[in-house]
Amino acid sequence: MYQPDFPPVPFRLGLYPVVDSVQWIERLLDAGVRTLQLRIKDRRDEEVEADVVAAIALGRRYNARLFINDYWRLAIKHQAYGVHLGQEDLQATDLSAIRAAGLRLGVSTHDDMEIDVALAARPSYIALGHVFPTQTKQMPSAAQGLEQLARHVERLADYPTVAIGGISLPRAPAVIATGVGSIAVVSAITQAADWRLATAQLLEIAGVGDE
């Protein structure tokens, strides 16, 4: 049963681009995307604060679900829609502070054991990855593939889920067919020859998410 310790999110978050700049946040919001994540890695809070503030303001303007990856203190300070954390960040994060601030929480997982850890935190949604090999970031685990993804989705049938990792436009329909509520994409949009067309096609497949 879906009873998160954090504010709930829609069961289907739809297309969920993960990008590293405010410019991409603005482009995608303008293109109709309504669930996004700002993921800027390996910089100090003070170096990214202006970008976090700008991204959150854009999310509000478009009434979108804007998640901040990792920088949970800044997300709380500036009242983001939500925070996304990797497994390695869970232990070092004050989850009670995120909860008290009324922010949603998403957690990454890569296998059944990590799903157990995520469920113990009772987040707003659980990300399942990486589905396919990905060049976007170094991954310590093997790609899960569609069969494993479908098994995890079935296990988490009552939970909002997000598939991530190597999801290209041609692969997206098969990923959605597993029943997962959302697909997170990176290079499928940011490295597309025509990002507007790629975004429109992915929105056709995954939707904008439930209200």
From Swiss-Prot:
Any idea which GO molecular function terms this record carries? magnesium ion binding; thiamine-phosphate diphosphorylase activity
**Required cofactor names:** Mg(2+)
Instruction: Describe which pathway this protein belongs to, using the record's wording.
Output: Cofactor biosynthesis; thiamine diphosphate biosynthesis; thiamine phosphate from 4-amino-2-methyl-5-diphosphomethylpyrimidine and 4-methyl-5-(2-phosphoethyl)-thiazole: step 1/1
What is an example of a Pfam family matching this protein?
TMP-TENI
Q: What is its EC number?
A: 2.5.1.3
Q: Which residues bind 2-[(2R,5Z)-2-carboxy-4-methylthiazol-5(2H)-ylidene]ethyl phosphate?
A: T134, Q135, T136, G166, V186, S187
Query: Would the keyword Cell membrane turn up in this protein's UniProt record?
Result: no
GO terms (BP aspect):
thiamine biosynthetic process; thiamine diphosphate biosynthetic process
Q: Is Iron-sulfur one of the keywords? A: no
Positions contributing to 4-amino-2-methyl-5-(diphosphooxymethyl)pyrimidine binding: Q37, L38, R39, I40, K41, N69, S108, K137
Where do the annotations place Mg(2+) binding? Answer: D70, D89
Top enzyme class = transferase
Write down how the cofactor binds this protein. Binds 1 Mg(2+) ion per subunit.
What are the protein's UniProt keywords?
Magnesium, Metal-binding, Thiamine biosynthesis, Transferase
Any one GO CC term of the record = cytoplasm
* Record field: catalytic activity: 2-[(2R,5Z)-2-carboxy-4-methylthiazol-5(2H)-ylidene]ethyl phosphate + 4-amino-2-methyl-5-(diphosphooxymethyl)pyrimidine + 2 H(+) = thiamine phosphate + CO2 + diphosphate; 2-(2-carboxy-4-methylthiazol-5-yl)ethyl phosphate + 4-amino-2-methyl-5-(diphosphooxymethyl)pyrimidine + 2 H(+) = thiamine phosphate + CO2 + diphosphate; 4-methyl-5-(2-phosphooxyethyl)-thiazole + 4-amino-2-methyl-5-(diphosphooxymethyl)pyrimidine + H(+) = thiamine phosphate + diphosphate
The UniProt similarity line reads: Belongs to the thiamine-phosphate synthase family.
- Report the HAMAP family cross-referenced here: TMP_synthase
Functionally, this protein is described as follows: Condenses 4-methyl-5-(beta-hydroxyethyl)thiazole monophosphate (THZ-P) and 2-methyl-4-amino-5-hydroxymethyl pyrimidine pyrophosphate (HMP-PP) to form thiamine monophosphate (TMP).
- Protein name (database record): Thiamine-phosphate synthase
Organism, scientific name: Shigella dysenteriae serotype 1 (strain Sd197)
